[in-house]
């Protein structure tokens, strides 16, 4: 069952493990986390625009400990836009994320797809993001508390952050709870298989978007992704389920179903519905 926790504040899920939730979870509105080790702080994801990451960074600073590490769960801008708020931290991510952050920002696409933040993207472009300093290409013990697990599904370079002693996993966008997922660069079938692993990792799962949940919410997401695969290109073929109460269905069902059908046909292409959403139709 998803937890009803406060937003825009550091909420302690377990000893030294905090979550920072943004209300809603729609496009551009993500979550972040903090893990405290003996040597200092590890930040998990950094949100997107200044109005989001500045309060988060201030709250992290108020903990009074050095920020040693910043983990990026994947390359999408709503998770990496605030990296420069932590200038002294080492930045850990997969090679795919590292490559993506070295590319120019597609500002016009951001403004079209996330129009609610259009006025802030020029500032984001001016500030920029930090490059990845340490690539993670497999399972890795980052600190005594933190284990990194590579995966794919939402993107080709997803990263799960497991804090085993707290029974908490930061899943990034491998998990959307109460929010329709977005697979425009993903593989719904592979993603569903990845969730078999993720559902067994911890009792507390912090999604990239939406409220904190657990294995039951992971299984609901898995069922939705499999429904997208089974729809064979027709969003109308997605049957009823827990997803009927999720936000952003109308916009994202076509993207997810089209992407699954394209991949099933051997075509690794951007779904037409996503091209329309970013103004490239």
Which role does the model predict for each range below?
Residues 2, 200-204, 212-281:
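Accessory terminal helices/loops
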Residues 5, 12, 41-42, 48-50, 99-152, 156-228:
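Metallo-beta-lactamase
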Residues 8-58, 160-172:
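Conserved beta-strand hairpin/beta-sheet module of binuclear metal-dependent hydrolase folds
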Residues 16, 35, 45, 60, ...:
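Divalent metal-coordination and catalytic microenvironments
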Residues 18-20, 71, 92, 134, ...:
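Hydrophobic/aromatic beta-strand patches that form the interior of the parallel beta-sheet core
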Residues 50-93, 134, 201-202:
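Active-site metal-binding motif and surrounding structural segment of the metallo-beta-lactamase
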Residues 95-99, 175, 233:
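Short, acidic/turn-prone active-site loops that include or flank metal/cofactor-
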